[in-house]
């Protein structure tokens, strides 16, 4: 891993530590990670539901546009609700996350996470997207349960001809 990438990760982690040191932010993270709303719902909300229903962040931009701005700025690995890099964590990732656990230990601990997941949920907390999802939860849930990707619909239609 290049030193520029490691440096970027360290800068990101330092900003995450600063953000989550605030008790209210850390409590919001714990509520999100331990709450009734699944990570899949967060992902589908920002990538699909918010587009179809033109959901806005109050006083800011569209949820979907903001999400893509973050992806452009960070990459999927550094902005991921699922924390998918677990199986391939590098020594740098492990060391950085140990630093995170150590730093916020006075407030609490977050286990089994990644820098990308912490970054994604910082964006969720800063923009009160968790509150938006909660206020529209039944509609979001229905949308997700009934959602069928275009590829599947086209394949199904081809099979019926």
Predicted segment positions?
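Long, compositionally biased non-globular segments that serve regulatory/targeting/scaffolding roles
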Residues: 1-98, 115
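Amphipathic alpha-helical interface elements that mediate macromolecular binding in regulatory proteins
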Residues: 77, 118-123, 127, 131
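Long, highly charged low-complexity segments enriched in Glu/Asp and Lys/Arg with interspersed Ser/Thr
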Residues: 126-155
């Amino acid at each position: 891993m290049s030193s520029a990438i490691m440096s970027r990760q360290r800068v990101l982690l330092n900003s995450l530590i600063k953000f989550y040191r605030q008790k209210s932010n850390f409590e919001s993270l714990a509520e999100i990670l331990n709450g009734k709303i699944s990570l899949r719902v967060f992902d589908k909300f920002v990538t699909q539901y918010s587009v179809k229903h033109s959901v806005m962040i109050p006083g800011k931009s569209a949820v979907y546009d903001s999400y893509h701005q973050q992806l452009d700025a960070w990459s999927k690995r550094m902005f991921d609700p699922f924390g998918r890099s677990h199986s391939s964590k590098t020594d740098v990732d492990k060391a950085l996350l140990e630093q995170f656990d150590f730093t916020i230990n006075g407030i609490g601990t977050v286990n089994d996470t990644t820098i990308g997941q912490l970054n994604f949920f910082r964006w969720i907390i800063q923009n009160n997207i968790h509150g938006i999802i909660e206020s529209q939860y039944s509609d979001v849930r229905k949308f997700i349960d009934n959602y069928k990707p275009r590829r599947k619909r086209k394949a199904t239609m081809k099979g019926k001809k």
